[in-house]
Amino acid sequence: MVVDNKATITYVQLLKEDLVIMRLVPNDGLVPEYQAGQFITIGLPNPTEDNKIVRRAYSIASHPENRKYIELVIRWVRKPIPGRLTTQLFNAKVGDEISWIKPTGSALSINEKLPDGSKDERRIVCIGGGTGLAPFVSFAQHLHAVGDKREIIVLHGASYVDELSYKDLLTDLEYDSLDRGKDKWNFKYRASISRPQEWFNRSWGGQTGRVETFLRPKGGGFSPLEEQIGDKITKDNTIFYVCGWQGTIDGVMDFMKPRGFVTQHDKRADGSFEVKYESYG
């Protein structure tokens, strides 16, 4: 039997008409335990369905060390049919009550051990398409909070510059890396805009195209990602985490499969793999 807990919406930041950051605080004041990369299922009674609770899972953008609230970034997809729950969420306001079920999910858990039991010290590359960035915002804040020394790169793809939902937070984390030194905190954040020709994106001077174009080799044989880190990506030195629509997952694997990278679903006989992913469509 599903047990719904109750929480109150304490913060709403409307980034644009169809993109919002929302914070929830459980009514008992106790933020549930969870791991970076997990999702939480929330719900609201739908008045058009006899107040039946309509639920949906969302990746958590806040990090486990934050015991004040759960933060989500939510897209309102209105075509071809508006989402039943997201439509209600975009009409919700601070003070409204919402149901939730404890966080779960292991698809994007941070890999800490190699198959032989040794510590996984590979470079971490996180690729998020749209709101698929959320688990990696949690990753970045968590790894920063615990003082992880691994090299971490977060790549975000969006259609428009105002959809770079955590640009300021992630840029600040990169500045902290520059200030403290890479031996203490080694972090980079880069974004790509897929519609640079649109008037609204006229000021954008960064990477263009879908987020997986960071992996496409250029004339010299290095990809934009490899140029950023100053190193060649190999199976031994890098693990990828990917979240977004299935097209994003497929796009990443189109570049990585020819290089011998395999996913956790197709791991080798010895248990090794280089790509973990979660698709939400």
Where are the language model's segments positioned?
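Short, low-complexity N-terminal leaders and the immediately following helix N-cap/first helix
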Residues: 1-19
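Reductase modules of NAD(P)H-dependent flavoproteins
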Residues: 3, 155, 160-281
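FAD-binding FR-type
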Residues: 10, 21-125, 194, 271-281
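Active-site catalytic microenvironments for nucleophilic, acid-base chemistry
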Residues: 43, 142-146, 255-259
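Histidine-anchored nucleotide/phosphate-binding helix
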Residues: 60, 135-147
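Short, conserved loop/helix-junction motifs that constitute active-site signature segments
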Residues: 117-119, 145-148, 182-183, 232-235
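Ser/Thr-glycine-rich phosphate-binding loops at phosphate-binding pockets of nucleotides
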Residues: 129-134
